[in-house]
Structure formats: structure tokens, C-alpha cells
Amino acid sequence: MKFAVIVFPGSNCDVDMFHAIKDELGEDVDYVWHDAENLDEYDAILLPGGFSYGDYLRCGAISRFANAMKAVQKAAEQGKPILGVCNGFQILVESGLLPGVLIRNQNLKFMCRTVPLRVENNETMFTSQYNKGEIIHIPIAHGEGNYYCDEATLKKLEQKNQIVFRYVDNPNGSVSDIAGIVNEKGNVLGMMPHPERAVNEILGGAEGLKVFQSILKYWRETYVVNA
């Protein structure tokens, strides 16, 4: 399996994401600059955290216009796994690939610590290696991670089982304790916590690795077994 880590000006978690795939998952991965126009050779696309374009205007607001995002849109339409973490999540909502918006944390402060999450849906290509209701501990590092959507959108997310992760002890004010959601098709996941920072016990925990193992499992079952 081959992953792409999209690198925007200001990305700073791309190395962590690359390490998670290459050294912990053991799969092929490339850094792909934001002006790339073709991602056809990749089986999964990863949008890392950071401060793309300095977070000017709004977090992710400028990145949505990058050439690579047109290719990400195409990959999403093809059903390929797309994972956006932190700033990557912000880019996904700005691009319209996921509903809602990320706003300033309720306390208006940057937060950087490990928090408990509850797995709400383990039937996605990103969470099949978890148990439903499982409590996992994943680092957060954000100033604008407060997920917001209107009541109609929230109702739709709940009805269609698109809420994948919830905070056990909401750190930022996110509506309905939301930490991560998928699109209706189930192949685009956005989450504020950083699973790539929890892939080895030496880092303090490895509970984030299952996100990437789930993607690999999906790909093998879909494209290798059926080949």
C-alpha cells in the first residue's frame, strides 16, 4: 500500500505522519508538495497538522485552493481513504469534504495534552481495529479545535453514524463532544486529536496506530484479497 502525506507551507506534523506509516505501519509513503496535480499512484491520502499558510484568514482557508486539494477531491470521489488530522481536519471542512467548521477553543487557549476519546463507530475503514465504546488516549495540540455545526447537520451526523470519535471530557467546547467525523460515504475522516503521535509505547502510547492499521486492513481486504 502506498500513502501520500500532503505538505503545505506551514505543515509541521508531516514528519510524524510519515514516521507512523513508514516505521510503525511498515508501508510505502511519500511526501507530496501542495502543488501536486496528480495523486493517482497513491492508495490513501493523509493531510497532516500544522499551520498551513500561517492559518491566515481561517485555519485551512487558503489551503483549500492548493492544486493538491483538487486531486484530493478526486481521490475522495474515487473512494480512497482520506485522513485529515488537526489542521488537516480544518482543511477538509474548508474544502467541503466534511460538514461543519472548527472555531476557537472555548477557553481561547492553545491546548497540548493527551485526552481520552471514545470510539463511537468501529465500522469505518479507519476504526475497524477498535471496539465500539473503547476508550483510547490520543494527544491534542490545537487552538481552534472547537467543532461546530448547526442542529440539522448534527442530527444528520448522528442519524448516519458519522460521528467516529467523541471526547470523554470535552477539552475545547466541541458540539456534542465531537472529536472526529466521516463523510457520508465513510472514506473521509477528519479528527482533531493526533493518532500519528500515539503509535509507539516509547511515545507514551500506541493507541493511535490502529487508525492506520484499519486503513491497511481495508485496503488489503478490498484490493489485495479480491485481486
From Swiss-Prot:
<dbReference type="GO" id="GO:0006189">
    <property type="term" value="P:'de novo' IMP biosynthetic process"/>
</dbReference>
<keyword id="KW-0378">Hydrolase</keyword>
<dbReference type="GO" id="GO:0004359">
    <property type="term" value="F:glutaminase activity"/>
</dbReference>
<keyword id="KW-0436">Ligase</keyword>
<comment type="subunit">
    <text>Part of the FGAM synthase complex composed of 1 PurL, 1 PurQ and 2 PurS subunits.</text>
</comment>
<feature type="active site" description="Nucleophile">
    <location>
        <position position="86"/>
    </location>
</feature>
<keyword id="KW-0315">Glutamine amidotransferase</keyword>
<keyword id="KW-0547">Nucleotide-binding</keyword>
<keyword id="KW-0067">ATP-binding</keyword>
<feature type="domain" description="Glutamine amidotransferase type-1">
    <location>
        <begin position="3"/>
        <end position="225"/>
    </location>
</feature>
<comment type="pathway">
    <text>Purine metabolism; IMP biosynthesis via de novo pathway; 5-amino-1-(5-phospho-D-ribosyl)imidazole from N(2)-formyl-N(1)-(5-phospho-D-ribosyl)glycinamide: step 1/2.</text>
</comment>
<dbReference type="InterPro" id="IPR029062">
    <property type="entry name" value="Class_I_gatase-like"/>
</dbReference>
<dbReference type="Pfam" id="PF13507">
    <property type="entry name" value="GATase_5"/>
</dbReference>
<feature type="active site">
    <location>
        <position position="196"/>
    </location>
</feature>
<dbReference type="GO" id="GO:0005524">
    <property type="term" value="F:ATP binding"/>
</dbReference>
<comment type="function">
    <text>Part of the phosphoribosylformylglycinamidine synthase complex involved in the purines biosynthetic pathway. Catalyzes the ATP-dependent conversion of formylglycinamide ribonucleotide (FGAR) and glutamine to yield formylglycinamidine ribonucleotide (FGAM) and glutamate. The FGAM synthase complex is composed of three subunits. PurQ produces an ammonia molecule by converting glutamine to glutamate. PurL transfers the ammonia molecule to FGAR to form FGAM in an ATP-dependent manner.</text>
</comment>
<protein>
    <recommendedName>
        <fullName>Phosphoribosylformylglycinamidine synthase subunit PurQ</fullName>
        <ecNumber>6.3.5.3</ecNumber>
        <ecNumber>3.5.1.2</ecNumber>
    </recommendedName>
</protein>
<feature type="active site">
    <location>
        <position position="194"/>
    </location>
</feature>
<dbReference type="GO" id="GO:0004642">
    <property type="term" value="F:phosphoribosylformylglycinamidine synthase activity"/>
</dbReference>
<keyword id="KW-0658">Purine biosynthesis</keyword>
<keyword id="KW-0963">Cytoplasm</keyword>
<dbReference type="GO" id="GO:0005737">
    <property type="term" value="C:cytoplasm"/>
</dbReference>
<dbReference type="InterPro" id="IPR010075">
    <property type="entry name" value="PRibForGlyAmidine_synth_PurQ"/>
</dbReference>
